[in-house]
């Protein structure tokens, strides 16, 4: 909304003007994705000298390379990154941290280091035939699409997975002219994907085959090499509830083949941060960094971690929220003062829930019609009109106000 109204310059100038005085503290952030960018934003406003390192050629991480333009226009992202640069943050690209020596130099040169790398190491299917031409990791496919390279996919695409990456890959393949099916081994209600994104995919004509698990990529010879000819799948049934709180998928004897010429794999990603353990930073068995749940300090006294590096694959919003918490604690850790609230205006607020409450459903944003959007990557959500925004604001029962003494309130919530 800020960009559509052309208000960003005045807001940028205000944020730059209200930066706290320089502290003389130097901080390094590894990873220029949602967590790294958010941490850099807050810490630079607090007066610290911040340098962000990233293995890619541009900042943004999953926002730049993974989330399609129809969800997040790249010009908006570029403006956000430009603001962070104007706040004084320095970016160093094409720099991967892969050895103890690199990490040691970073720790020695800074007052603290934040590890904010994303979960980019993709999980394979572990089935026969997945090495043939035409089987693509979702991250690789989405990155190519984000660079307008038009990834090589056939006319019949099967996407394996039930998360947001799977939905993004399916809707992107559709926009590239393919007929798309999603295969997921659990029930639709168990899909971790955002409900609105899944609904959008179904509206656009993408079919979802649930309780279905891949067992083999069927190949054919073409031009002297093996390519995808189909995906052999197995029907599943619901078993006992597992540790995730969902029924365990149990294989049945029903196995059949889905004809296709491309398979996009989106079944999960892992964090890979080589060299840190040799520096004394402890990790979980799956590669995530062990960090205190409140301070986000690791087992090394100068190394913090946040985002995917700690949580594993998470939403951009979760990573950015965690980065704000890290920035607040880190600032106090290196300055010895509680200064974070100086970034916000103080005001009086009567912390009371209105005595008269009326039910009001959530206002839905305006979306471009299906036929006008499914063949291109233009932004599909037009957001709220001014009147819709006012109505939605009126639904609030109280503001999320920070207090020195935290108080707990409860109030009925509407969908």
In which residue ranges do the predicted regions lie?
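FAD-site-proximal beta/loop scaffold in flavoenzymes
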Residues: 131-155, 241-313, 321, 352-354
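Glycine-rich dinucleotide-binding loop and its adjacent helix/turn
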Residues: 3-21, 79-99, 122-176, 284-294, ...
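Feature captures the FAD/FMN-dependent oxidoreductase FAD-binding
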Residues: 21, 26-30, 78-127, 216-232, ...
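Ferredoxin-type iron-sulfur electron-transfer modules in oxidoreductases and energy-metabolism complexes
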Residues: 1-19, 145, 373-391, 408, ...
């Amino acid at each position: 909304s800020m960009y559509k109204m052309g208000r960003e310059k005045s807001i940028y100038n205000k944020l730059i003007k209200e930066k706290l005085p320089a502290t003389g503290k130097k901080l390094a952030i590894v990873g220029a994705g949602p967590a790294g960018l958010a941490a850099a934003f807050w810490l630079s406003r607090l007066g610290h000298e911040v340098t962000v390192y990233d293995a890619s050629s541009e900042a943004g991480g999953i926002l730049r390379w993974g989330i399609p333009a129809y969800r997040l226009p790249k010009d908006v992202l570029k403006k956000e990154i430009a603001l962070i640069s104007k706040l004084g943050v320095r970016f160093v690209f094409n720099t991967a941290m892969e050895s103890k020596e690199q990490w040691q130099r970073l720790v020695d040169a800074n007052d603290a280091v934040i590890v904010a790398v994303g979960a980019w190491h993709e999980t394979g299917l572990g089935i026969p035939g997945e090495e043939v031409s035409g089987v693509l990791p979702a991250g690789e496919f989405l990155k190519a699409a984000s660079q307008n390279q038009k990834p090589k996919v056939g006319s019949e695409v099967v996407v394996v997975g039930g998360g947001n990456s799977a939905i993004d890959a399916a809707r992107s393949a559709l926009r590239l002219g393919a007929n798309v099916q999603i295969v997921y081994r659990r029930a639709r209600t168990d899909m971790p994907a955002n409900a609105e994104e899944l609904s959008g995919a179904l509206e656009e004509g993408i079919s979802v085959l649930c309780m279905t698990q891949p067992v083999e990529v069927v190949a054919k010879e073409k031009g002297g090499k093996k390519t995808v000819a189909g995906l052999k799948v197995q029907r599943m049934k619901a078993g006992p509830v597992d540790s995730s709180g969902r029924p365990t998928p149990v294989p049945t004897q029903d196995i059949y083949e889905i004809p296709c010429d491309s398979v996009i794999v989106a079944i999960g990603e892992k964090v890979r941060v080589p060299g840190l353990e040799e520096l004394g930073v402890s990790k979980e068995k799956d590669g995530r960094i062990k960090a205190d749940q409140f301070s986000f300090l690791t087992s090394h006294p100068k190394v913090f971690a946040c985002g995917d590096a700690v949580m594993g694959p998470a939403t951009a919003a979760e990573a950015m929220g965690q980065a704000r918490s890290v920035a607040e604690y880190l600032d106090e850790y290196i300055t010895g003062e509680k200064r974070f609230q100086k970034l916000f205006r103080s005001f009086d607020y009567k912390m009371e829930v209105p005595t008269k409450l009326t039910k009001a459903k959530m206002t839905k944003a305006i979306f471009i019609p299906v036929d006008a959007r499914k063949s291109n990557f233009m932004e599909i959500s037009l957001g709220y009109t001014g009147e819709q925004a006012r109505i939605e604001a009126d639904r609030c029962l109280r503001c999320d106000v920070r207090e020195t003494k935290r108080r707990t309130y409860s109030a009925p919530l509407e969908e």
